[in-house]
Amino acid sequence: MSEKYIVTWDMLQIHTRILAHRLLKTKNAWNGIIAVSRGGLVPSAILARELGIRCVDTVCIASYNYDCLQKNRKIIKKARGDGEKIIVVDDLVDTGGTAKIIRNLYPKAYFVTIFAKPLGRLLVDDYIIDIDQNIWIEQPWDMSISYISPLIKK
């Protein structure tokens, strides 16, 4: 993946709040959120605040190792239940591998992401931003702000 899409903290909060507005419009009485660790943790915290949801759990699936997709995903921890009246939150749906696991674990859940790539898009119930399949998304928790020398000094 040669191109990168840089996500700032501000962008993430704005997009997640847009998702919260959409979820409010569904008029569903949500009982909780399941955050897909780790990418869904920050969006889940924002959604929980905006929707007034106090019950937040996690499902922990190892699918990425820093910047490369793992072929074999490992379920480390599951949340209980079938997902009824639950929002499952991840930061993105990429190839759909993790999303298929989520759908099997929580068939009654409402599955949302902030970003969606073409191969996984149909596996989520809602998302905010379309991303091309060949673009790598850099999330704010994976980056830091650092000094860059002026061009004249290079």
Curated annotation (Swiss-Prot):
Biological process (GO), any one: purine ribonucleoside salvage
Pfam family membership, one: Pribosyltran
Reaction catalyzed: GMP + diphosphate = guanine + 5-phospho-alpha-D-ribose 1-diphosphate; XMP + diphosphate = xanthine + 5-phospho-alpha-D-ribose 1-diphosphate; IMP + diphosphate = hypoxanthine + 5-phospho-alpha-D-ribose 1-diphosphate
Subcellular location field: Cell inner membrane
Binding site for 5-phospho-alpha-D-ribose 1-diphosphate: 38-39, 71, 90-98
Binding site for xanthine: 94, 137
Binding site for guanine: 94, 137
Major subcellular location class: membrane
Signal peptide location: none
TM annotation in the entry: none
UniProt pathway annotation: Purine metabolism; GMP biosynthesis via salvage pathway; GMP from guanine: step 1/1; Purine metabolism; XMP biosynthesis via salvage pathway; XMP from xanthine: step 1/1
GO cellular component terms, semicolon-separated: cytosol; plasma membrane
Alphabetized InterPro entries for the sequence: PRibTrfase_dom, PRTase-like, Xanthine_Guanine_PRibTrfase
CDD domains assigned to the protein according to its UniProt record, in alphabetical order: PRTases_typeI (cd06223)
Binding locations of Mg(2+): 91
Molecular functions (GO terms): guanine phosphoribosyltransferase activity; hypoxanthine phosphoribosyltransferase activity; magnesium ion binding; xanthine phosphoribosyltransferase activity
Membrane topology: Peripheral membrane protein
Role according to the record: Purine salvage pathway enzyme that catalyzes the transfer of the ribosyl-5-phosphate group from 5-phospho-alpha-D-ribose 1-diphosphate (PRPP) to the N9 position of the 6-oxopurines guanine and xanthine to form the corresponding ribonucleotides GMP (guanosine 5'-monophosphate) and XMP (xanthosine 5'-monophosphate), with the release of PPi. To a lesser extent, also acts on hypoxanthine.
Family the entry assigns: Belongs to the purine/pyrimidine phosphoribosyltransferase family. XGPT subfamily.
The protein's name in its UniProt record: Xanthine-guanine phosphoribosyltransferase
Protein species of origin: Buchnera aphidicola subsp. Schizaphis graminum (strain Sg)
Name of the gene this protein is made from: gpt
